[in-house]
A protein has these predicted regions:
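Conserved N-terminal entry element of GNAT/NAT acetyltransferase domains
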Residues: 1-12
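Active-site rim helix/loop that mediates acceptor-substrate recognition in acyltransferases
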Residues: 34-57
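Short hydrophobic/aromatic beta-strand element in the GNAT-like acyltransferase core
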Residues: 55-60, 67, 120, 185-187
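Conserved acyl-donor/pantetheine-binding loop and adjacent beta-alpha core of acyl/acetyltransferases
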Residues: 66-128, 144, 179
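Conserved GNAT acetyl-CoA-binding A-motif
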Residues: 118-120, 145-157
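Conserved beta-strand-loop-alpha-helix junction that forms the acyl-donor binding cleft
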Residues: 123-129, 153-163
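Conserved acetyl-CoA-binding loop-helix of GNAT-fold acetyltransferases
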Residues: 128-143
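Conserved catalytic-core motifs of GNAT/GCN5-like acyltransferases
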Residues: 171-187
Length: 192
């Protein structure tokens, strides 16, 4: 697991994620228009990857095909600002990103007591192609949670990894349809 990444690694990761996230429910929520999703994913990762890497919130697989982020919900921001923000603002999808983020923050504040340190685990990649890499990154995040004493909170709009996460010791704390969408949201915790 790498906490930092050079420009070449970020570029390779972004290229792979732009492809994988086309059919990911999170990006389908963020950008419902399939024809625009690739462009949106490119803008999203251009904006976020470098920021996550600088804050040591981004962890990349050796193949650069999958990544996870560990973000404290207290660090969530509800605006895009700074480098590479304008294209994302103009994409027309900011509202969806922020609605999802606020919903996650609200659910986590109910599932995990306020006084507990926590990190939101988000997985970027294709479980069908890179399952072992994803599980490897998750296991390293689990160890980090144990070592540093925080609750690891996995939030997903896909059921693809829920069973695997349960087998590793995650527990479902919340599972419901996401607002009035076609997506089913699951929030799981580890090291609670």
């Amino acid at each position: 697991m790498k906490g930092t990444a050079d420009k070449q690694a970020l570029d390779a990761l972004q290229k792979n994620l732009n492809i994988y996230m086309q059919t990911d429910p999170l990006f389908m929520l963020f950008c419902p228009q399939k024809a625009k999703r690739s462009d949106f994913a490119d803008k999203y990762f251009t904006y976020y990857l470098e920021k996550w890497a600088e804050k040591k919130q981004l962890f990349i697989s050796e193949s650069r095909k999958t990544a996870v982020t560990l973000i404290d919900p207290a660090d969530y921001r509800y605006k895009f600002s700074g480098k590479n923000s304008l294209p994302l603002k103009l994409s027309g999808n900011s509202y969806s990103v922020f609605v999802h983020r606020k919903a996650v923050e609200s659910i986590v504040s109910i599932v995990v007591p306020v006084q507990k340190n926590k990190r939101i685990l988000t997985i970027y990649g294709n479980p069908a192609e890179n399952f072992d890499e994803i599980i490897g990154l998750v296991k390293q995040c689990m160890k980090k949670a144990e070592d540093e004493g925080f609750v690891l909170v996995y939030e997903t709009l896909s059921k693809k990894l829920v069973t695997a996460m349960e087998q590793m010791g995650f527990e479902i704390g919340y599972a419901k349809q996401f607002m009035n969408t076609q997506f089913f949201q699951t929030v799981m915790t580890y090291n609670f």
